[in-house]
Amino acid sequence: MKSHFWIFAVFVFCVATFDVIAQVTEGIHFYMPFNEEKGKVVKDVGPKGFEAELHDSAKFVKGKVGTAIEFSEGPAVIIDPRPGGPSQLYVAHLTVAVWIYPFEISDEVFGKGHLYGNIFYDKSGKSDDNVEFGLGSGEGLYWYINSGEKKMRPFNPADVNTTLSLPNLGLKPENWYHVVGTFDGEKVQVYLNGKLEGEKDVPRHGPVMLWNENDIHIGGRPNINDGANLYKGLLDELVVYDRALTTDEVVEVMNSTNILTVDFADKLTTTWGVLKTQ
């Protein structure tokens, strides 16, 4: 009878764990663990098969999990290798999650809390921005989603956007941090090491995601401010979703060494070992 109880307990655990796996893998847009170890192209190991072309200065180094990319003088460019038709890179909602190891952190508070080191960046028009996620002023983080219409016009100061600037988070150079920005159409949120650090409601008339033919960059915003918006440091385990993750999912992603498996085998082995001692 006792053995039947523990078999049932294992079954319940397996069902619950598979449910978590389904939640964390649902909506993966691209996942780049950066474990190639060499070369100038990194692969999306998710279902869509995107790629990132690295800057000449980028190099593979020991990372948080396996290897990471060291950025210093220029960003990587995300591309859709499939020819023809509209790009599949564009989404309505968004989560960007990544491990960062910055070489430089500024304790200065800049005007409007703007950022100085872009982690993830896309431009929506000739002079306006669509998405910005990066290091912010005052040892903090910065998350920006633009507003507007499907056919983006040149920059208009009256455009509604949602900027979540979180200074004074205490970021220090040469430390690993797991950072996450989410946007679900109703609010934006920023997480640091699995903790929700801030959120902001989206204005009633915007913003929306404004994608076009402009490149998506990771590891810096090129050709602006004499390089001030280039990220200098390591990035590892970049995963982008086409939806906003929940807090529990953010923690699960942070604790995973492979988003596509969520360490199921290790969890099952550990749990079965505990059950056998009962």
Regions found by a protein language model. Name each.
Residues 7-19:
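Bacterial N-terminal signal peptides
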Residues 1-7:
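Bacterial N-terminal signal peptides that target proteins for export
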